[in-house]
Amino acid sequence: MRAMVMDAAGRPLVARDIPMPEPEAGEVRLRIEACGICRTDLHVLDGDLAGPKLPLVLGHEIVGRIEATGAGVTAMSAGQRVGVPWLGSTCGRCRHCLRGAENLCDAPVFTGYTRDGGFAEYCVADARFVFPLPDGGDPVALAPLLCAGLIGYRALKLAGPAERIGLWGFGAAAHILCQ
């Protein structure tokens, strides 16, 4: 399959043929319809975030359709449209995971950083961390919702029934939240 691969920080991505990923137990493989480009992707590429797996396929705003499922995946099936976000999986055992704050996990896996992401024709993802998406939606419009959209939604949910909220800065998350 074709992918845009990062070999080192500060160097351009390279179009390359790489092996088709196979889903392991608990994973799904999807054919990618769209993948957004987030500022975080640029931070990884520029070397601002240390420690990415190399070589690496960037991209964590992924929209695609499931083509294959690994053992134990029963809630999703081939042909289903799903989204894959930055948080690719968590340990489920640390104090943060146990209290429902998976975003603070002690041993997270990040899509397009510590595992290959969506700047490719296909990717694999942990089935517990993908979101069902509507069949009729535009994949290009849906992709940013898997990063900035989730951040904005979480902020609004944490605000509770407040009549007013403050927005610090006005990036993609705030823009989507206001819509």
How would you label these PLM feature ranges?
Residues 10-15, 47-49, 113:
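Short gly/ser/thr-rich secondary-structure transition/capping motifs
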Residues 19-20, 53-59, 111-115, 121:
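Short Gly/Pro-enriched turn/cap motifs at secondary-structure boundaries
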Residues 21-35, 46-95, 129, 134-137:
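Glycine-rich beta-strand-centered segment in the early N-terminal region that forms part
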Residues 40-43:
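Cytochrome P450 core scaffold surrounding the K-helix E-X-X-R motif
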Residues 75-76, 87-131:
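Cysteine-cluster motifs in flexible loop/terminal segments that predominantly coordinate metals
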Residues 82, 135-179:
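Mid-domain Rossmann-like dinucleotide-binding core that forms the NAD(H)/NADP(H) cofactor-binding site
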